[in-house]
Amino acid sequence: MKIFFSGSIRGGNKYRRQYGQILAFLQAFGETISEHSDRPEAFDDGGLKGDAAIYARDTHWIREADLLVAEVSQPSIGVGYEIAYAEARNIPILALYHVGAESPMSAMVFGNPKITSIRYDSLSELWPVLKDTLAETHLPPK
């Protein structure tokens, strides 16, 4: 299973440290094809030249994905766009939301029946729920 992980980069990096832990967890279930989200160079566009190159790279990765997992605790137009892009291509979507986040989550995400939303208080609380949810996706294993 190919997993595209989406998390705020330019919109804020409060949850950046958690991205790495979530990515490491997801690697047990498949190939993560967007690990750039937890690397410092991602905040400098990962060495790509210009916004068009980043758009082309990320949309290519999403089209290649079997699943999109988005950490949505930090509001981000880019993450919302990636979610909509995946939805338009019938790619399953999991949205992870930290209940202690400063901003409430958009009803456009939590109200969407095509998106599986998981609220969590701590990463240790998230792991078993995420594991069970990934098992229920019935996507090809790693």
UniProtKB/Swiss-Prot annotation:
- Report the superkingdom from the record: Bacteria
Listed EC numbers: 3.2.2.-
Entry keywords, A to Z: Glycosidase, Hydrolase, Nucleotide metabolism
Example GO molecular function: 5-hydroxymethyl-dUMP N-hydrolase activity
Keyword Lyase applies: no
Classification via Gene3D superfamilies: 3.40.50.450
Q: Which residues bind substrate?
A: F4, F5, S6, G7, S8, I9, R10, Y19, H36, E82, S106, A107, M108
User: Is the Kinase keyword given for this protein?
Assistant: no
Which PANTHER family does this one have?
Answer: 2'-DEOXYNUCLEOSIDE 5'-PHOSPHATE N-HYDROLASE 1
Question: What HAMAP family does the database record attribute to this sequence?
Answer: Nuc_phosphate_hydrolase (MF_03036)
Primary role: Catalyzes the cleavage of the N-glycosidic bond of deoxyribonucleoside 5'-monophosphates to yield deoxyribose 5-phosphate and a purine or pyrimidine base.
Q: What is this protein called?
A: Putative 2'-deoxynucleoside 5'-phosphate N-hydrolase 1
